[in-house]
Amino acid sequence: MLSMFMCNNIVDYVDDIDNGIVQDIEDEASNNVDHDYVYPLPENMVYRFDKSTNILDYLSTERDHVMMAVRYYMSKQRLDDLYRQLPTKTRSYIDIINIYCDKVSNDYNRDMNIMYDMASTKSFTVYDINNEVNTILMDNKGLGVRLATISFITELGRRCMNPVKTIKMFTLLSHTICDDCFVDYITDISPPDNTIPNTSTREYLK
């Protein structure tokens, strides 16, 4: 299943990603009339990922547009409030992860797109995804594969239009990805005062 695109693609590029980084720096529910229906837990729901990320594909009526506006507002307020509460150290780690994951996504854009398209033809539960990622990270201790996994899971979240399933996936996968290896990498990269130097991304990655 997931191994068809995760193991055969991400792992195939682990060495390239690691070396590159080292060199650079390092819904339908509301329409259900069966009141006895038992809804599946989020972790047991099947994930389907669409090849198209065009949001207009999901906004066909005025109600769809209004609901999306409300959802965006509520989500943004929640994230903005969370960011305001974060200490400087956490914000500095956010900046580091932004820099590195953006670099991986840009440098390996073609490879990532191949994996996204392959994922679009499959369906998985959150545990399918988590188990595959866990296996990959146990076998590969490099920083590159962890950054690639973050970028990959983030893009899958963009293509999964169900926000409940997306949040569940992000929550569980963040626990799996942030193993001792990744924590050590990020804390080693972080400047002593937990601030990001005011330099270009390229300079910082050298």
From Swiss-Prot:
Superkingdom of this protein's organism: Viruses
Inducing stimuli: Expressed in the early phase of the viral replicative cycle.
One Pfam family recorded for the sequence: M11L
Subcellular location: Host mitochondrion outer membrane; Host cytoplasm
Gene3D superfamilies cross-referenced by the UniProt entry: Blc2-like (1.10.437.10)
Primary location class: host cell
Keywords tagged on the record: Host cytoplasm, Host membrane, Host mitochondrion, Host mitochondrion outer membrane, Membrane
Any one GO cellular component localisation term in the record: host cell mitochondrial outer membrane
GO biological process, one term: regulation of apoptotic process
Family as reported in the entry's similarity comment: Belongs to the orthopoxvirus OPG045 family.
Physiological role: Plays a role in evading host innate immune response by inhibiting host inflammasome activation. Interacts with and inhibits NLR-mediated interleukin-1 beta/IL1B production in infected cells. At the host mitochondria outer membrane, interacts with the BH3 domain of host BAK and prevents BAK from binding active BAX. In turn, host apoptosis is inhibited.
Subunit structure as annotated in this protein's UniProt entry: Homodimer. Interacts with host pro-apoptotic protein BCL2L11 (via BH3 domain). Interacts with host NLRP1. Interacts with host BAK.
Name recorded for this polypeptide: Apoptosis regulator OPG045
The organism of origin for this protein: Vaccinia virus (strain L-IVP)
